[in-house]
């Protein structure tokens, strides 16, 4: 039985990475350094732009985060692909929250637009995921649109984020 809370702490997210939050059959979040959020502040089965589910999560920014030291030397910026991965992570987390079982895999994205950047001087990144559809058949899949904000300003959008849960990934 999934503990369907509306919010999750960093400790909860780390437990998900160890397979302890949604049980061993549920999807796992990655462990640090690839875990791209510090907390989930809202999860609902309704709401969002399509009234089919909504997730909001946050990442605290500080200049010591690992990616600022290598991307780029003398011009530190959070790689845009990490924001995209965070959105995929949240789609998979939501599928586990709904009770889905399997190993989460990103399946694609329709379009991504970058209109800003995350610098080491920022304070907080906010991720917003608006679910469009959940497929619960042989393959469990989530389809959503996402937004990334830095200190309240919209900087990335993604349409048609797709994540599936697989019982067997050997042929994937």
UniProtKB/Swiss-Prot annotation:
Keywords: Cytoplasm, Fatty acid biosynthesis, Fatty acid metabolism, Isomerase, Lipid biosynthesis, Lipid metabolism, Lyase. Pathway: Lipid metabolism; fatty acid biosynthesis. GO terms for biological process: unsaturated fatty acid biosynthetic process. The active site is at residue 71. GO terms for cellular component: cytoplasm. CDD domains: FabA. InterPro entries: FabA (IPR010083), FabA_FabZ (IPR013114), HotDog_dom_sf (IPR029069). The keyword Lipid biosynthesis applies. One of its GO terms (molecular function) is (3R)-hydroxyacyl-[acyl-carrier-protein] dehydratase activity. It holds the Pfam family FabA. NCBIfam families: fabA (TIGR01749), PRK05174.1 (NF003509). Homodimer. This is 3-hydroxydecanoyl-[acyl-carrier-protein] dehydratase. It comes from Escherichia coli O6:K15:H31 (strain 536 / UPEC). The gene is fabA.
